[in-house]
């Protein structure tokens, strides 16, 4: 579907004059991020860029048109140009782009930069006519691209207007060369050479200066003047006299009177016909005009100098100069308006022969030939859907009237899938209901296959809307209706059946359904659905207590992502999310944190509401490390997101766990009570997220001293967990039950429950749940271990837990949290200097991190502040504590810790 001419730089520059004053300015271009040619139309931006780069080996060229405002099209063309510039060093990124397997342009560009690390040669990529881009997402992504691209790459932009690419910042930092219309406008010397090259009689300096002043050095106007002199066999003096009133606003009139009317009618008609096309080759022109001499005509007109640019490549691609193309379009609409629809229709048919349905449907829409639009959609609609042309498809479908749209059930279904694929779930049911009603009005009999596809789609919407029973009913109905060959909908329906059984706690049914879904999806190469099935299987296995098996299955998910270039799709974040949850439960916090941050990067360009899970995990990790200030920032994000959006209980339960653990660490019982007052209480607890929500409720009651309510919640939890064989949740519930018993001073019961939990942990490995309440259960674990009440495996686990609890407590001290500082400043033996020159909370944190061996940069990253801010904190604490250097700071911190008994 890609047009070769958009990726080829203009050729045949032998008629262009050499411009040393501009070329001299460009000699230092390799040391700059951006070279910007900015001027109004017709100043030779493209020609100048092409001339400058003509002898450079590593150049990629991208000629932009207004259809490139679609991010998918833009990035595909850009990466093809980059590959040409870097000897195809970005091939993996190109595959990702072609398959639309990226969550945002930023994340895709990160892959590009990683691949470009191996290419060290000077290279250039040209974005020609960038002013046609009006998509803010593309602008923002290109700002990111310019900021982070490797030093050996220079981006060259031609544009009529100042592009919103952060040029002010680049200019201030001296990272941009800007060639404006002042530089591109011909000076007198260049004007003289220009006309001497084209006019037999030549030109003297005075006349050249007059001409240059007359048109303000505008190259296109000078070209028009030269053309007039050539074709009318007039001297330059006569030509100048005839255009004495020429100005930019009169360009169309000038072109008509002095150029266009001089052509024979056949040539004029040919040009107006061809101007329907933005880019063209002889095959397209032949299909459009039925002229067998199409290539000869084009080359003849190119020699004639009528602003037709030949483009590099073997397929004889050409395009009009933008200005001349606009003029021809103006003339076409004025002179042959009755042919407009036929021309666009013929152009659509011509592009179909070039196997470019995207271009074809664009012209079909302009021709308002709805029958042709329907024909293209019926033949290529699903192919375009799979290739990500969603905006184009929706625009075309919206142009159809009701009769046409609903006379073709295939298009009705495509319209509904477009809504689903763009996350407009609430519209899908309405669209399908409307289609059903309209089909009945037209006596269109809907076969069971269509109804099966509709039910599969509605089943997916129902499960997304937390209506599992309805989703199951629809999915099973869809499977009974669908033909075996309709694999996409059968896979979706099978997946929904598995997911519903998972949600209802029927894990033994859910797992085989998801295994079947994965098998079908792999067989038919529907890899997104295969990944989804792997994720569901992993969650089911975790719930069943087979956590190591789930972990290994996740590895197969990561392999699938790598093999099929799925790194940038949102499902990758889902996999990282459940991997982080397992790692947190195994107390592998650094790895869990890495997964959470990777997830945020993948979702960078999605709605902030999708970041809730990542922030929940990051908060939990910070709490586990005792970094409560850092956790507080994540908690603020969580609370803001939960106020702004409505979430599934799976999301809110995870977020609420982090909130409760944070408030527990802060001793904020008021916040816990406020949460409990409004907490959702699911009717059942037959799946992992309902179990988590009820466990949050039990934990809240414990923190508030409401032990009877906590007991009631835990009894309900364990009853449901045993009923549905939720092994891992049973394990987690036992830990909370032990905490409740300890709070109620029932030590024997607490130890019994802990022992049972430790036995189960041999299978699940769930140690993180013990560590969240280390202060409560640490002593109990020690007593269990000393009394030899545990088996060897359980004793080893208990000893490791005690070690981790001790390490976490020390970590909290090293990070100098509020409790530690309060005890320190009130200690009778604390140095007087600490009392009289109290450090701020942040300065204490910085001192603790210095003691832990963190560099200034690492401290800034840890506290999420600027490096200059850290330097200020260090300077202040050095001054307050009379410290000269980092070595003395470490000694001071160590002395304070020893004073406190660490």
Curated annotation (Swiss-Prot):
Domain HTH luxR-type residue range list: 832-897
Alphabetized InterPro entries for the sequence: P-loop_NTPase, Sig_transdc_resp-reg_C-effctor, TPR-like_helical_dom_sf, TPR_MalT, Tscrpt_reg_HTH_MalT, Tscrpt_reg_LuxR_C, WH-like_DNA-bd_sf
Keyword ATP-binding: yes
Portion annotated as DNA-binding: 856-875
Sorted UniProt keywords: Activator, ATP-binding, Carbohydrate metabolism, DNA-binding, Nucleotide-binding, Transcription, Transcription regulation
A molecular-function term among this protein's GO annotations: DNA-binding transcription factor activity
Residues reported in the UniProt entry to bind ATP: 39-46
Function: Positively regulates the transcription of the maltose regulon whose gene products are responsible for uptake and catabolism of malto-oligosaccharides. Specifically binds to the promoter region of its target genes, recognizing a short DNA motif called the MalT box.
Family: Belongs to the MalT family.
Record-given protein name: HTH-type transcriptional regulator MalT
Recorded name of the encoding gene: malT
């Amino acid at each position: 579907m890609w047009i070769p001419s958009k990726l080829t730089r203009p050729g045949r520059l032998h008629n262009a004059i050499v411009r040393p004053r501009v070329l001299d300015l460009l000699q230092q271009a390799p040391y700059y991020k951006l070279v910007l040619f900015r001027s109004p139309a017709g100043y030779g931006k493209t020609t100048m860029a092409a001339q400058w780069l003509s002898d450079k080996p590593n150049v990629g060229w991208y000629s932009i048109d207004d259809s490139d405002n679609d991010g998918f099209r833009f990035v595909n063309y850009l990466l093809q140009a980059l590959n040409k510039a870097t000897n195809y060093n970005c091939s993996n990124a190109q595959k990702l782009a072609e398959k639309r397997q990226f969550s945002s342009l930023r994340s895709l560009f990160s892959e590009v930069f990683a691949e470009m690390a191996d290419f060290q040669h000077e290279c250039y990529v040209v974005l020609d006519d960038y002013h046609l881009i009006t998509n803010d997402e593309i602008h923002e992504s290109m700002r990111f691209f310019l900021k982070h691209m490797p030093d050996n790459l220079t981006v060259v932009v031609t544009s009529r207007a100042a592009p919103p690419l952060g040029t002010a910042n680049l200019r201030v930092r001296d990272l941009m060369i800007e060639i404006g219309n002042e530089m591109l406008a011909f000076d007198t010397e260049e004007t003289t050479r220009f006309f001497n090259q084209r006019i037999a009689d030549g030109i003297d300096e005075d006349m050249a200066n007059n001409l240059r002043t007359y048109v303000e050095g505008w190259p296109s106007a000078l070209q028009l003047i030269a053309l007039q002199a050539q074709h009318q066999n007039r001297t330059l003096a006569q030509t100048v006299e005839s255009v004495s009133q020429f100005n930019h606003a009169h360009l169309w009139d000038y072109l008509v009177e002095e150029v266009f009317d001089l052509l024979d009618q056949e040539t004029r008609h040919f040009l107006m016909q061809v101007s329907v096309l933005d880019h063209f080759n002889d095959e397209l022109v032949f299909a459009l005009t039925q002229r067998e001499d199409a290539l000869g005509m084009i080359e003849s007109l190119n020699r004639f100098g009528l602003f037709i640019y030949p483009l590099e490549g073997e397929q004889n691609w050409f395009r009009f100069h933008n200005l001349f193309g606009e003029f021809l379009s103006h003339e076409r609409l004025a002179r042959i308006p009755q042919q407009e629809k036929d021309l666009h229709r013929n152009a659509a048919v011509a592009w179909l022969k070039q196997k470019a349905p995207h271009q074809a449907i664009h012209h079909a829409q302009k021709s308002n030939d709805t029958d042709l639009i329907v024909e293209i959609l019926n033949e290529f609609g699903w192919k375009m859907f799979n290739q990500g042309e969603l905006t184009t498809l929706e625009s075309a479908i919206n142009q159809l009237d009701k009769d046409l749209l609903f006379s073709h059930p295939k298009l009705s279904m495509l319209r509904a899938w477009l809504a689903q694929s763009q996350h407009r779930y609430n519209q899908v049911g309405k669209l399908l209901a409307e289609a059903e009603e309209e089909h009945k009005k037209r006596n269109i009999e809907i076969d069971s296959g269509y109804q099966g596809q509709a039910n599969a789609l509605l089943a997916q919407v129902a499960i997304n809307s937390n209506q599992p029973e309805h989703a199951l009913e629809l999915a099973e109905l869809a499977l009974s209706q669908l033909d075996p060959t309709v694999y996409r909908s059968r896979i979706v329906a099978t997946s929904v059946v598995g997911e519903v059984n998972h949600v209802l706690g029927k894990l033994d049914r859910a797992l085989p359904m998801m295994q079947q879904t994965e098998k079908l999806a792999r067989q038919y190469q529907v890899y997104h659905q295969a990944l989804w099935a792997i994720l569901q299987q992993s969650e089911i296995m975790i719930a069943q207590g087979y956590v190591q098996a789930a972990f290994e299955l996740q590895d197969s998910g990561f392999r699938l992502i790598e093999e099929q270039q799925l790194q940038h799709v949102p499902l990758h974040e889902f996999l990282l999310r459940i991997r982080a949850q397992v790692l947190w439960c195994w107390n592998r916090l650094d790895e869990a944190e890495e997964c959470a941050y990777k997830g945020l990067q993948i979702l960078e360009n999605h709605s902030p509401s999708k970041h809730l899970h990542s922030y929940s995990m990051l908060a939990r990790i910070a709490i586990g490390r005792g970094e409560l200030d850092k956790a507080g920032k994540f908690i603020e994000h969580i609370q803001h997101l939960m106020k702004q959006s409505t979430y599934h209980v799976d999301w809110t339960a995870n977020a609420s766990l982090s909130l409760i653990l944070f408030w527990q660490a802060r001793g904020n019982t008021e916040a816990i009570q406020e949460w409990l007052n409004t907490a959702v209480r699911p009717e059942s607890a037959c799946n992992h997220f309902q179990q988590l929500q009820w466990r949050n409720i039990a934990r809240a009651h414990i923190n508030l001293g409401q032990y009877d309510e906590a007991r009631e919640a835990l009894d309900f939890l364990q009853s449901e967990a045993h009923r549905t064989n939720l092994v891992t949740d049973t394990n987690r519930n036992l830990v909370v039950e032990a905490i409740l018993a300890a709070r109620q001073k029932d030590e024997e019961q607490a130890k019994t429950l802990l022992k049972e939990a430790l036995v189960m942990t041999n299978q699940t490995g769930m140690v993180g749940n013990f560590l969240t309440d280390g202060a409560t259960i640490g002593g109990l674990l020690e007593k269990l271990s000393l009394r030899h009440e545990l088996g060897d495996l359980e004793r080893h686990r208990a000893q490791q837990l005690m070690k981790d609890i001790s390490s976490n407590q020390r970590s909290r001290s090293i990070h100098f949290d509020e409790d530690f500082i309060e005890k320190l400043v009130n200690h009778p033996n604390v140095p007087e200097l600490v009392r009289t020159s109290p450090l701020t909370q942040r300065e204490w944190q910085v001192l603790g991190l210095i003691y832990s061996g963190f560099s200034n940069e690492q401290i800034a990253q840890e506290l999420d502040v600027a490096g200059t801010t850290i330097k200020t904190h260090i300077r202040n604490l050095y001054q307050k504590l009379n410290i000269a250097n980092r070595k003395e700071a470490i000694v001071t911190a160590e002395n304070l810790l020893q004073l406190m008994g660490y």
